[in-house]
Amino acid sequence: MAADNGQPKMQAALAALQRADAALERASRNKGGHRERAIELVRQAMGAVDEGMRYAAAHPTEVGRMEGPAMPEPVDENVPGAERQPNMAQAIVELREARRQLREAKHDKGGYRVQALGLIQQAIAEVREGIRFANGGR
C-alpha cells in the first residue's frame, strides 16, 4: 500500500473499491461473465488508485493542472432488478462511493485518478449488465 501522503480521498476511494470487490466476490456466478469482468475492472481501479497515491508521495510538491469543482453525482441511477441481486447492488453502492471520492480528490496523481475513474465507470456498467443478465434479461 502506498504512503498516506495526506491523500484521504484516495484512501477512501481505495477502501470503497475493496468493499466493492468483496461484494462482487460474494455474488453468485450466474451473471453471464459480467461479474468476473467487473471484478477485473475493480482490481485494475484499485491498482490505479494505489499508483496515484504512490505518485503523489513521490511528487509531494507537484501541484498539477488547475481543476474545477468535481462533477456532481447523478441524482438517480436506478438499477432495475438490483433488489434481487443484493451483493451486486452493494457493489454498485461502493463503486459510486469510490467514484465520488476520486472526483473530490485533489489533482490528477500522474493520470492515475482519471484512469481509476474510467475503470470504475466501466465496472458499474458491467455490474448493471450482470444484474440484468441474472434477472433474465439476456
Question: Which residue ranges define each predicted feature?
Answer:
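Long, charged/polar, soluble alpha-helical segments
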Residues: 2-138
